[in-house]
Amino acid sequence: MPVESEHFETLQLHAGQEPDAATSSRAVPIYATTSYVFRDCDHGGRLFGLQEPGYIYSRMMNPTADVFEKRIAALEHGAAAIATSSGTSALFMALTTLAKAGDNIVSTSYLYGGTYNLFKVTLPRLGITTKFVNGDDPNDLAAQIDENTKAVYVESIGNPMYNVPDFERIAEVAHAAGVPLMVDNTFGGGGYLVRPIDHGADIVTHSATKWIGGHGTTIGGVIVDSGKFDWKKNSKRFPEFNEPHPGYHGMVFTETFGNLAYAFACRTQTLRDVGGNANPFGVFLLLQGLETLSLRMERHVQNAFALAKYLEKHPKVNWVSYPGLESHVSHKLAKKYLKNGYGAVLSFGAKGGPDQSRKVVNALKLASQLANVGDAKTLVIAPAYTTHLQLTDEEQISAGVTKDLIRVAVGIEHIDDIIADFAQALEVA
């Protein structure tokens, strides 16, 4: 029977699934199939014409992915979701469903390095430009919106600045201009720490590779449509949702799909044509991660806060950045929006500058030095020399990256062991 609970802990286990009708399997099966049998020619025609819901081809939809999509949509308070092959593919398809050559997006400069590079280098090759705003002040973002802007973009917890945007004010200025707010909520832990849609976001993306999967075993992403943006009211800015579509014999998406016009366009146009779909085997691993997400996030944020407070008092540490600390620039907004903890990632710099910070990273034993976050294990990296290496020095500063910055994605090991590892590294470096 359908789950009616609003509790995150229950939804992460049950939303989007009923036991398999044919086998009564309690676990979500892996549907390793490319395609699905039509009852007859007319049935196949109705499916291809989007006149009837159902499965056609696994590049667009898959029963295993369908459970994951419904579960994430429930956890994020969205109306629909699309599973993708990675977080980057989720972001790329989420944006290119909205924007075409000649359009732009307005974005904070506080971004993950891969996203910054996508916006700066790859999207311009398609004729889509980005207006970068230094910081995330709502008025500064609003000032950059013009008639060709298709989205305002921020991260729920910036990587690696850990700024927390004022979602409600940013949504207000974006909506006043008829523009949707898109939020990457990867650092929000699948909606456990914050649900941007509750605060005005229209589209949410995730790298499900991170805390959703939680074990460093597979790559995946997801796009969530709030179902709240009025595409019909803003038809001049978004004609593709409001005019006859040449690929579907003149179908008008807002008339056929109403508030889910964006989600259907993303699936039946962008996902179909780009091919960034999620693999059912990978989705199965993501579903395993989802089942313990709240439990892991509790330990992640508990450990991160404890490590941040330890490092803040350490005589060999120059500075610490973590939203839970009163010294952090976003502490007040973090208290407002992050109701289940201040995040699972922190940064710090060692006294002695960049060379000393690099020595500390190299001296760590328990923590793994690699390019990922959200694993159950503690992970570290020096972003200036890795994830943000492609940025110029000026761009690194605008993204919140300094040469001495050590990023720590705090795991769920015993906190005494985590602290002991950093203590010995700071001592021997």
UniProtKB/Swiss-Prot annotation:
Pathway: Amino-acid biosynthesis; L-methionine biosynthesis via de novo pathway; L-homocysteine from O-acetyl-L-homoserine. The keyword Nucleus applies. One of its GO terms (molecular function) is O-acetylhomoserine sulfhydrylase activity. Pfam families: Cys_Met_Meta_PP. It is found in: Cytoplasm; Nucleus. Keywords: Amino-acid biosynthesis, Cytoplasm, Methionine biosynthesis, Nucleus, Pyridoxal phosphate, Transferase. Its main location: cytoplasm. This is Homocysteine synthase. It comes from Schizosaccharomyces pombe (strain 972 / ATCC 24843).
